[in-house]
Design a protein with these regions (language model features):
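Short, C-terminally biased terminal segments at protein or domain edges
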Residues: 1-131
Length: 131
């Protein structure tokens, strides 16, 4: 089990959620139950899945939740592009979010790679012991 609050990726994802909520407050009220709700839920999903995965008992399970978090980041980016296309976001704001999301995606991929490597090494060690 990992201490998720100490993970830099979780901390950065939490910053993203705060920034997303601040920006979506300015969206039209007609979007409250539509795009705003979808964007906010998607943003919340990113650190939530990191935390849930960190609380699991194995690297393999953690990787599965990181993959869900990773997919949510692409979904969020798509929703933000839609928001820009319908003039709810400026290009500058979209670019700032895109940079934040890209950083999270890189961190997520790196963490998944480390966990997979660790998991694979443990499996190999067990096989070596059995032989």
């Amino acid at each position: 089990m990992h201490q998720y609050k100490e993970l830099k990726i979780w901390q950065k994802a939490m910053e993203l959620v705060t920034n997303i909520y601040q920006v979506t407050k300015g969206f039209p009220n007609v979007e409250r139950f539509g795009l705003v709700s979808q964007i906010n839920r998607c943003a919340v999903s990113i650190p939530s899945n990191i935390a849930e995965g960190a609380g699991r008992n194995s690297e393999k399970e953690f990787v599965r939740f990181l993959a869900i978090s990773h997919a949510s980041s692409f979904e969020l980016e798509t929703q933000l592009i839609i928001s820009r296309n319908i003039n709810y976001l400026s290009n500058d704001t979209l670019n700032e979010f895109t940079e934040q999301i890209a950083e999270l995606q890189k961190m997520n991929f790196a963490l998944q790679s480390r966990l997979i490597s660790s998991y694979s090494n443990k499996i190999q060690s067990v096989k070596n012991i059995e032989n």
